[in-house]
Amino acid sequence: MPDIKLFAGNATPELAKRISERLYISLGNATVGRFSDGEIQVQINENVRGSDVFIIQSTCAPTNDNLMELIVMVDALRRASAGRITAVIPYFGYSRQDRRVRSARVPITAKVVADFLSSVGVDRVLTCDLHAEQIQGFFDVPVDNVFGSPVLIDDILKKKDLVNPIVVSPDIGGVVRARAVAKLLNDTDMAIIDKRRPKANVSQVMHIIGDVTDRDCILVDDMIDTGGTLVKAAEALKERGARRVFAYATHAVFSGSAANNLANPALDEVVVTDTIPLSDEIEALNKVRVLTLSSMLAEAIRRISNEESISAMFDA
């Protein structure tokens, strides 16, 4: 194995620690802090000349601080003559701003971030469940987008008390993801929630395509933000006779009123991964369970360093 160096910012310290343990490689010695005026301070405290360096840093909230930490760390390592620098970004912030809506005068911020990372000296990006896969094309360097679904599916398969389970897509846009999950769950049945607003200033109506009566529903998505739409979906499923509702998502964004929304009894359990640390408020709910992606990300790092196939990790 080449000389691998692992470094971590302040966004996901526990995930970084787990990855380092899986690889039997200690995290690199670096100072990542703040100057008295709030500017980011980075210093690499060990030799990285010619090394294959991986920086583990989600760009979750505080998004701008974590993104800037990553960028400054890349620059510090580049100036220290690192051989190759891979940004391991388990959760890629700004991924939802991936296109202009109609003729709106808005930026494509995902492209801005991609340009920023490329220009500062990142040689490769490893990320997980991009909100829009086309973001890979925004970069001028290779991007490996791995999937959290195998970890989520393995957990679902361990639920021995599921009654007549059915996979549910929370919207039309998530049908491909839900279908893939349903296929891996022994071709489980699937339902779709079709959200429509009949006319302006009228509440959104949720139509459920599929029979969920007396069934355990498994809602799958790439991320949960405020959880408002998720709760409405769970309520609609319960109103249609669903027995229980479980929500599975890779990224636990959990912003704004998420804690209040997730406390809604319509949701029986929420299962996420550790790409984003949970706040104390969310942990106090005792309804949210976290799975780790450390083994998968560690294996991806090993394969990248050894020039092995990443896609082979997900071959059926």
From Swiss-Prot:
PROSITE patterns the UniProt entry points to: PRPP_SYNTHASE
GO cellular component, one term: ribose phosphate diphosphokinase complex
Compartments, as annotated in UniProt: Cytoplasm
Chain residues that bind D-ribose 5-phosphate: 197, 221, 225-229
GO-annotated molecular function: ATP binding; kinase activity; magnesium ion binding; ribose phosphate diphosphokinase activity
Binding note for cofactor: Binds 2 Mg(2+) ions per subunit.
Domain of life according to the entry: Bacteria
Location of the active site: 195
Quaternary structure (record): Homohexamer.
Biological function: Involved in the biosynthesis of the central metabolite phospho-alpha-D-ribosyl-1-pyrophosphate (PRPP) via the transfer of pyrophosphoryl group from ATP to 1-hydroxyl of ribose-5-phosphate (Rib-5-P).
Protein name: Ribose-phosphate pyrophosphokinase
Native source species: Haemophilus ducreyi (strain 35000HP / ATCC 700724)
